[in-house]
Structures are given as C-alpha cells and as structure tokens.
C-alpha cells in the first residue's frame, strides 16, 4: 500500500482509481503514520513547541497563564480533531483543568484557515488553503477554498516559519492558522485529496516516489470548493440508511463521508461531527447536508442545525 493509513484512491475510486497510482513508497495520510515515518520533522506535532517557535506566551498545565482567555489542549494529539480541547476564560475555569498532558496558549481571534502545502526539500512548491466558518470552538459550518489574493497573504505569513523549521522536508504539510499565528502542524494532507484533482494527487505520488514536482495549475484546477460539516449532540451514536442516502445524493457531490461513531471521541465535548459533504457548489453541499440531517437517527438536536448555512427542515 502506498497511501497509509487512509487511502484516497480506495476512498474515492470514481475520482482517482484510473489516474492515481496505488503502489510504491509509503505516503503518510494520517498523523500516527506520519509520526513514525518523518522522524526528523515530527517535532511539529508538539503544539507547545510550535507555539514557542512563534514567541507566544504558553506553558504546561498547571503553570499559571499570563493572560485570559486561553486555549487548553493536549501537547500531542495524533487522533486529530479537537479532542480534550477547551477554552478557559478565567483562573477559576483554568484551575478546574487537571490534565498533565495539556498546555495553555492564547485564544486567538481572527479567521481560521487550513493550509495545505507541498514541499520539496523544504521549499514550497504548491499551496491550497481553506477558510473555516466557525459555529463554536472546535466546530465549523463549512470550509471554502480561498482565492489567490488570500493565498498570497497567508503565504507571506507562514513562509518565514516554513523556511526556518521545515528545511529538508519533502511531502505534504498542513498548517492551521488563526489570525496571525500557526496553531497546529501536520505532516500530511489536510483536505486537498477531496478536491477531485487527479493530476494533483498523481503529482503528490510522483513527488514521494521520484523526488520531483511536476504539477502545473490548469483550467481543471478548482477555484471554488466547499466542505460542509454536520455536527450533532454528544453521547449519542447516529446512523443513517446509507443506501437510500447514497441513491439520493451520491452522484450530485464530489465526495461525502458519514463519520464512524467509533471516532466521535476526537471531537470537542459540546458536539460530534457526524458527516461531511464536498463539492464545487455551496448549494449542493447545503442540500445534501439538509437531507442527511433529516435522515439521521436519532434526531439531531435543533440547536446544531438552526445556525447552519442554508438549513431547511425536511421530512423524509
């Protein structure tokens, strides 16, 4: 297997099976595999070190924060998501945190971006970025592909950090940025595999196998793309008539995913993501999400649905 442990060729065969190789050297697509594979650069999974590398005030729990509000989260999290992350607005809330594996850092205000970079020997070869429309801490309504102007602004922000700390790295690098600061780094793709760009995915395979970057943007390169999430109340397991749902929406989207209930633990405490929907048109992902919400069992609490872009209550 080339792609490990998540295989986009098998997950999205309608997009990639005929164009993207599925053999050759290992290409990490999940954090636990990347941690083992990229031993020299895996320090970036230490979120405390990433914060310190930018000169931020931060420290291990239970050291006292220098300001509030702060975000408290695990120093390491190879599961993904917002597991065990929380916001503390004052010392009373912070004092209730008893977790030796966590650290605190400032709560950043501003736009939240997920940036996918392709690096060759530490040099940025390509970049795609997405802006998240927040619902509440750790949860998002939808993500949208940024335009070139926004990409240029983000590149100016992150490029000095990449040049200083990613020297010699070849592969995918996902950075999460809020405002002017990098909050997380992952040695893998973020969401670019969902774009449906087979030439891009083939180029990533070629980069890992032949150590050269061949991708050139063209008229097929997506300029608009949306990923809509569906969240629901915690402490419940949700299910759906998958065959019926796929019959209704399967051919209308680039990709969708009904999340595995066994992975709900990676979500923030106030809610679990139960599905995502991906397409070049926002109306399409909103339509599919509304249908999914109506078909989910048990019913999703209305407080998770009413704030969503384009939400309409359906009876199915």
Enumerate the predicted regions with their spans:
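ATP-binding N-terminal substructure of ATP-dependent carboxylate-amine bond-forming enzymes
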Residues: 1-52, 282-316
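Short loop/turn hinge sites at secondary-structure boundaries
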Residues: 22-24, 55, 209-214
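Broad, structure-driven detector of short, well-ordered beta-strand segments within folded domains
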Residues: 113-119, 175-177, 265
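A short catalytic or substrate-binding loop motif that flags glycine-/basic-rich loops and adjacent residues
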Residues: 107-111, 166-171
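Peripheral (often C-terminal) accessory segments that flank ATP-dependent C-N-forming ligase machineries
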Residues: 206-316
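ATP-dependent carboxylate/phosphate-activation module, predominantly the ATP-grasp catalytic core
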Residues: 117-167, 179-227
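A short glycine-rich, hydrophobically flanked beta-strand micro-motif that places a catalytic Asp/Glu
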Residues: 167-180, 276-277
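Active-site nucleotide/adenylate-binding loops and adjacent lid/helix of ATP-dependent enzymes
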Residues: 29-161, 316
């Amino acid at each position: 297997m080339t792609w490990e442990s998540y295989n986009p060729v098998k997950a999205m065969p309608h997009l990639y099976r005929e164009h993207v190789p599925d053999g050759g050297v290992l290409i990490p697509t999940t954090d636990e595999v990347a941690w083992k594979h990229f031993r020299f650069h895996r320090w970036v999974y230490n979120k405390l070190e990433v914060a310190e590398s930018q000169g931020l005030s931060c420290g291990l729990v239970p050291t006292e924060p220098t300001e509030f509000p702060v975000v408290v989260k695990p120093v390491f999290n190879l599961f993904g998501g917002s597991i065990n992350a929380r916001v503390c607005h004052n010392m009373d809330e912070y004092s209730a945190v008893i977790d030796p594996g966590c650290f605190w850092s400032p709560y950043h205000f501003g736009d939240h971006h997920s940036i996918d970079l392709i690096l060759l020997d530490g040099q940025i070869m390509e970049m795609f970025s997405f802006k998240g429309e927040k619902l509440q801490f750790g949860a998002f309504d939808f993500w949208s592909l940024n335009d070139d102007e926004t990409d240029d602004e983000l590149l100016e922000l992150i490029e000095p950090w990449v040049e200083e700390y990613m020297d010699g790295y070849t592969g995918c690098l996902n950075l999460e940025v809020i405002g002017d600061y990098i909050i997380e780094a992952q040695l893998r793709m973020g969401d670019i595999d969902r774009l449906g760009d087979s030439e891009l995915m083939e180029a990533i395979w070629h980069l890992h196998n032949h150590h050269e970057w061949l991708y050139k943007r063209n008229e097929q390169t997506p300029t608009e793309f949306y990923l809509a999430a569906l969240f629901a109340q915690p402490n419940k397991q949700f299910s759906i008539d998958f065959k019926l749902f796929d019959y209704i929406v399967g051919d209308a989207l680039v990709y969708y995913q009904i999340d595995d209930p066994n992975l709900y633990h990676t979500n923030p405490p106030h809610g679990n993501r139960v599905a995502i929907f991906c397409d070049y048109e926002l109306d399409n992902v909103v339509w599919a999400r509304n249908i999914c919400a109506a078909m989910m069992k048990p019913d999703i609490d209305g407080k998770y649905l009413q704030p969503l872009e384009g939400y309409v209550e359906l009876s199915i």
